[in-house]
A protein has these predicted regions:
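Dinucleotide-binding Rossmann-like beta1-alpha1 core, especially the glycine-rich loop
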Residues: 58-139, 143, 311
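C-terminal catalytic lobe of FAD-dependent flavoproteins
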Residues: 316-425
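N-terminal Rossmann-like FAD-binding beta1-loop-alpha1 element of flavoenzymes
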Residues: 15-41
Length: 425
């Protein structure tokens, strides 16, 4: 390998691992793999500027609990437990902030119909073994005084948290490079194979990097890269999300309390529509997010922004005084059952770490730890079973007991029930 930080694009190089994609998943995998002594090449023309850049950074497996997603809930809980140590290690290694907060999530309902949906949400969460604190309208406003008086009731998930994905990505990139990973600011145009095994990638400038392992973490574009044999490509698609960042011009008060309207993440149902507001210590408030099946469209629309601001203002009228700092659209990598695709496939040397949909930031620690362990040992973790590519009929490699395609079909059917019953999107 060349010296740390060298430009690999002009060379034909060899590495232990090539990570394709520099979002929060790819960055985390690259960091963990480099930490265990492997020579890592991370390929992405703009690391951290895909779905990660547009993410709110909610760490809310409990509040996100949904029908047909029990396995994702368990994986999310596992990853949330890892987060404090994950960010502490990251910040110690780099000296960079991540915006990590663990102040909880308050789920609220605006009217009687929304309250019925919130009740259904509570029943679902209890079926997962989670019992949240039920709050009256008065208790909701005591917890968050800036809530509108019309809020009817709430559920408090005290262990939930949030992180700033943009800060997290910057810290992960520095940590990965400090651990020895080499960043190539180019896209991967082809997965190369030889003798029945993935053995490298071709970059946009036509140079080649050979590697023992290729980790496909390219988000919604994972299935579009050339060179994937028939039946191997993971079934990911782009799902558009628009998100708004607001900020206050106020400064920290005399007691050192940061500015802001909210103390914790608030997720609301407003006349059947869902909205979330995620506060940052800086005083920034993130409002999101739409969910639109429009292919690779990344247009910010007046309608999408209006709906988000309308619902957010209904819950927290004070947002009208905030400055608009940023409005962006991103593309989440969705799968037919909303769950990620993690693990090896029938093409030896190729490992999936994609399709994390709404939960990429949340699932980064557990995905990175699990994939890095596989890169070290070559043995699939049984915990991957619900997320094996074989559940879609893709020619993956399944740990014993992995689900088949019929599981994904049942899950996809369950999504329709979830959308009608919970509306927490």
């Amino acid at each position: 390998m060349p010296a740390k930080g060298a430009d690999l694009s002009a060379h034909r190089e060899t590495a232990d691992v090539v990570v394709v994609g520099g979002g929060v998943i790819g960055l985390s995998v690259a960091w963990r793999a480099a930490q265990q002594g492997q020579q890592v090449v991370l390929a992405d023309p703009q690391p951290g500027l895909g779905a990660t850049h547009a993410a709110a950074g909610m760490l809310t497996p409990i509040a996100e609990a949904a029908y047909a997603e029990r396995e994702i809930f368990g994986l999310g809980q596992d990853s949330l437990r890892r987060y404090p140590d994950f960010v502490a290690e990251l910040q110690a290694a780099t000296g960079l902030p991540t915006g990590f907060r663990q102040a909880g999530t308050l789920q609220v309902a605006y009217d009687s119909d929304d309250l019925a949906v919130l009740t259904e949400t509570r029943v679902l969460q209890e079926s997962f073994g989670v019992h949240l604190q039920q709050l009256t309208a008065r208790e909701c406003r005591a917890a968050e005084p800036m809530l509108d008086p019309s809020v009817r009731a709430g559920l408090l998930a005290p262990a939930d948290g949030s992180v700033d994905p943009r800060l997290l990505a910057a810290a992960l990139l520095r940590a990965a490079e400090q651990a020895g990973a080499h960043l190539v600011r180019q896209s991967v145009t082809e997965i190369r194979s030889a003798a029945g095994r993935a053995d490298g990638v071709r970059l946009a400038d036509d140079s080649v990097v050979h590697a023992r392992w290729i980790v496909l973490a390219a988000g919604w574009q994972s299935a579009a890269i050339a060179g994937l044999p028939t039946g191997i490509a993971p079934p990911v698609r782009p799902v558009k999300g628009q998100i708004i960042r607001l900020r206050t011009t106020a400064t920290t008060d005399a007691d050192g309390v940061p500015p802001g309207l909210l103390q914790r993440t608030v997720r609301g149902i407003v006349r059947g529509s869902s909205v979330y507001l995620v506060p940052r210590d800086s005083g920034e408030l993130v409002v999101g997010a739409t969910q639109e099946e429009l292919g690779a469209d990344m247009t910010v629309t007046a309608g999408g922004v209006w709906e988000l601001l309308r619902d957010a203002r209904t819950l927290v009228p004070g947002i009208t005084e905030l400055e608009i700092a940023d409005i962006v659209a991103g593309l989440r990598p969705g799968t037919p059952d909303n769950a990620p695709v993690i693990g090896p496939c029938e093409l030896p040397g190729l490992v999936f770490a994609t399709g994390h949909f709404r939960a990429g930031v949340l699932l980064a620690p557990v995905t990175a730890d699990t994939v890095a362990a596989y890169l070290r040992t070559g043995t699939p973790d049984p915990g991957w079973r619900p997320f094996a590519a074989t559940r879609f009929g893709v020619r993956g490699v399944s740990p014993p007991g992995s689900p088949g395609p019929e599981v994904a079909e049942r899950a996809a059917a369950g999504m329709q029930v979830e959308e009608a019953a919970t509306a927490w999107r």
